[in-house]
UniProtKB/Swiss-Prot annotation, chains A, B, C, D:
Chain residues that bind substrate: 10-12, 149, 184, 205-206
Any Pfam family the entry gives: TIM
Keywords: Cytoplasm, Gluconeogenesis, Glycolysis, Isomerase
Annotated pathway: Carbohydrate biosynthesis; gluconeogenesis; Carbohydrate degradation; glycolysis; D-glyceraldehyde 3-phosphate from glycerone phosphate: step 1/1
Organism: Methanopyrus kandleri (strain AV19 / DSM 6324 / JCM 9639 / NBRC 100938)
Domain of life: Archaea
PROSITE patterns per record: TIM_1 (PS00171), TIM_2 (PS51440)
Localization in the cell: Cytoplasm
Gene Ontology biological process terms, A to Z: gluconeogenesis; glyceraldehyde-3-phosphate biosynthetic process; glycerol catabolic process; glycolytic process
Homology family: Belongs to the triosephosphate isomerase family.
Protein name per the record: Triosephosphate isomerase
Keyword Cytoplasm: yes
Primary role: Involved in the gluconeogenesis. Catalyzes stereospecifically the conversion of dihydroxyacetone phosphate (DHAP) to D-glyceraldehyde-3-phosphate (G3P).
Length: 226, 226, 226, 226
C-alpha cells in the first residue's frame, strides 16, 4: 500500500533545487531518511524527475509537482500520469496553490493517478476546499493557506483551526485520506503543532530548500514527529 | 428557504434567447409555471438578467448562468455575487461544462453565493465530480455528461447509472443538496426517467430554447414530473 | 467611423458603479460630455449594460468591460459580441489586466467585434504586449502597467517611457490604431502628460468612480485635454 | 546566431515518444541529420528533456514543448526558461494549440526565452494570430490550423493561403522572424508545397512519431526541402 510520508519537501522552481542542486537536495533527503528511519517525500521539477528517481528512488518517495489532465497522445507540453509512472516516480502533488486546476480536470487526473498506482496528494487552500478535494478520495489532502506560504509563519500555529477543521471535514468525506498541512512550516515545533492538531504530516518548501543547511533543517522538522 | 425548481431552463447564448427573445421565453416559463403550479427556473444571459427579473421575477426563479469568484471592487468584466443579488435574481448556476471553474474559485464563489442567499447550483460532469461539488454543500448539483449535452439523447436513459450514482454520492457528502440531471433532456419521458432514478429535477437548454413551440416543450417536460 | 473617446471610464465591479449607481454615474458622464463637447466613454458591468445604453446611449460611448470568444449558441455564462451589439452598446474593452485572454481567443474575439462594428479597445501591460495587441488592428490599444492600477500614481508621470514606446510600436504595426494609457490617472495634469507623450486619450476607473465628486473629477480630467 | 531547423518534430505526449522511445526517436533524428546534412529539431516531453540532450544534444536542436511564464522561485509544477537552459536544451515551442497561453504570459515568456538565448518558436492558429505572435519578434512563428492537426491533410495543400498570408504578415511586423507551418504534414511533397509558399520549414508530430518507420518518414520529409 502507498504510504504518505510525514514530511514532504516541494523543490518548486527554486534555483537551489534544479539540476545538480536537485540531486544534492535529493541525497540530503535520502540521508536524513536513512538516519532517522522516517520516510521522506521530495518533489523535484519536471525536468529533474528522472534523474532524481535514478539517484534516490529506492530511498525516498519521489513525487512530481503536478500532473496534467491529459492522456497519452497528441498533447503538447503536458506531463501525463503515464509519464510520471514511466519515469519511476511514486506519486504527485496536484492543485498546488501555484498550479490550481479546474475541478473537472482535477477529478480526471486524480482518478487517473490513483488508477496508475501513484500516491496522489491534492492541495487545498482551506477546510472547505479540503472537503471538496477529499471527496475525490486521494491518498492525502494538503491544506495550505496561500497567504502563509513562504512566510515562515506556520499554519499550524497561526491558524490552528484550519488544520483541525480540515482533518475533521476530510475524514467526513473520505476516512482513508491522510491530511497534511503546509505553509510557513520551518521547524520541529511547527511540525509538532501540526501533528497535535491531527495532521498526518507536513508539506514544506522554502523552509528546507532555502535553508543554510537543508539537512539540519530537515532533521529539525522530523524531530517534531516524535 | 430556497427551493430548487424541478425544471430549470438554461438560455445559454442562443440567439433565440437573447434580448426580446429572452423576455418572450421568460414569459412562456411564467405562463407554464402558473398553469401547472410547478416552479420553473430560467437562466438568461448576463446582459438580460435585469430585464428578465423585472418581467417575470415574481413568477419564476431567475438564475444567472455563472458568477465569477470576485468581490466588489477593482474587477473588470466580472459578474459578482453581489451584482446578481442587486439585479434581483434568485440564484445562479456555477461550473457549467461551458464555463468550468478552478476548484478554489468554485469553492470561494459557492460560499459567497450561499452567504448572499442565492440559490446555488453547481454543475458536474459525472458522479465523482458531483461528489466533489456536493462537498461544497450547494443547494443543488446538476450532473451533465458533456458528451450528451445538446444531443437529444437523454442522460436519464442513455446513462442511468451516472444519475443514480450521483444521487447516492452527493447525499453521502451533503444530505440537503438536491440532485438535478441534464444533457439531452427533451421530453416528459426523459424527465420521468430522471425522477425515477432519484433526481430532484432536470436542467434543460436546447430542448426548450430551440423547440418549435417552447411552451409545448416545457409543458411536456413538466408532464414527466407527475 | 468609430471614434475612440479621449476619456473612458471603466466602472469595474465597484459597488459605487452597479445598478442605480451605474445609472447615476452614466448621467454624470453624459452631462460632462454635453457641457464640454468632449466625447466620453463608459464601461458599465455586464448586468447594467442595457440599462445604461437606454439611459445615455445617445450621449456617450457605451462599452462592455469584456466580451468572450464565443459565438451565439450553446455557451453558458458568456457575453458574446452579438449580445453587446444587440444591447445597443458601441464597443468593448478586451484583455483588461483583470480579465486577461488567451492570445488565440483575443484574436478571435477582436476580429469578431471589429466585424460586428464594435469599437474594440485591447488592453496591454507594457509596450511589447501593446505591439502584439496592435498587430490585431483594433481601434485602440490601452496600455496599463498593472502595478500602477488603482494606485493614484499616474503611468504618464511614473513611467512616461512605456507610453511613448507603446505609441511608437503600436503605430509600427497598425497605423490607424489609437493608443490610450491608463493606471493611476486621477487629474487633468496626468491626462495632459499622457497626451504630450503621444497618447490619444486615457482609460480611468477608481479616479472617477471612487471620487467624492465624480463630475468634478471627470471635468478635471478633461481639462487636461486642452 | 540561432538557426531555426527546417524540420522540427514535436514528440507530444505520444507513448511512442516517451522514455526509451524518446531516446530512440532522438537517435533517429540525429542519424537523419547526419546523413542528410539538414538540421533537425526535436521536442521531447519535459521529463525526457535532459536525457535527450545528453543523448543527441550535440547533433540536433533540442527544444522544450512549452515553457511557463514563471521566474525561478516559489512556483510549483512549472518549467521555467532557466530550467530549459540548465537542462542544456536549445530552445522551446510556445503557445502550441494544445497549450495556449494568455497574451500577457506569452509576451513575458517569449521575452524571457529570447533573453536566455533560447530559440523561441511561437505557434499560431492562423495568419492574424501569426501576426500578433510575430509582433513579439520570436525566432519563428509556426502556423498550425488546429482543425488540420493530426489529420494527415497537410496545411500546405489544404489551406495554402494561410501559409502565404502568414509569411506576408509576419514579415510585416518582424522581418527576421522565420515562418514554419504545420498540421497534417506527412511527406516530402507537403514540405515542398510549404517551402514554395514561402515557409522556412515545417513542424510535424504524428507524421513522424507514429510512422511505421520514423527514419524513412523523416528522410521523406527532408527530401521535400531540396
Amino acid at each position: 500500500m502507498l504510504r504518505v510520508p510525514p514530511v514532504i519537501v516541494n523543490f518548486k522552481a527554486y534555483s537551489e533545487a534544479v539540476g545538480e542542486n536537485a540531486l544534492r537536495l535529493a541525497r540530503v533527503a535520502a540521508e536524513v531518511s536513512e538516519e532517522t528511519g522516517v520516510e521522506v517525500g521530495i518533489c523535484p521539477p519536471h525536468v529533474d524527475l528522472r534523474d532524481v528517481v535514478r539517484e534516490v528512488g529506492d530511498e525516498v518517495t519521489v513525487l512530481a509537482q503536478a500532473v496534467d489532465a491529459a492522456e497519452p497522445g497528441g498533447r503538447t507540453g503536458h506531463v501525463t500520469p503515464e509519464m510520471v509512472v514511466e519515469a519511476g516516480a511514486d506519486g504527485t502533488l496536484l492543485n498546488h496553490s501555484e498550479r490550481r486546476m479546474l475541478l473537472e480536470d482535477l477529478k480526471d487526473v486524480c482518478r487517473a493517478c490513483i488508477n496508475e498506482g501513484l500516491l496522489t496528494i491534492v492541495c487545498a487552500s482551506d477546510a472547505l476546499a479540503a472537503r471538496a478535494a477529499g471527496a475525490l478520495s486521494p491518498h492525502a489532502v494538503a491544506v495550505e493557506p496561500p497567504e502563509l506560504i513562504g512566510t515562515g509563519t506556520p499554519v499550524s500555529k497561526a491558524d490552528p483551526e484550519v488544520v483541525e477543521r480540515s482533518v475533521e471535514v476530510v475524514k467526513e468525506v473520505s476516512e482513508e485520506t491522510a491530511v497534511l498541512c503546509g505553509a510557513g512550516i520551518t521547524d520541529g515545533s511547527d511540525v509538532r503543532a501540526a501533528v497535535e492538531l491531527g495532521a498526518d504530516g507536513v508539506l514544506v518548501a522554502s523552509g528546507v530548500v532555502l535553508a543554510d543547511d537543508p539537512k539540519e533543517a530537515l532533521l529539525d522538522l522530523i524531530s517534531g514527529l516524535e
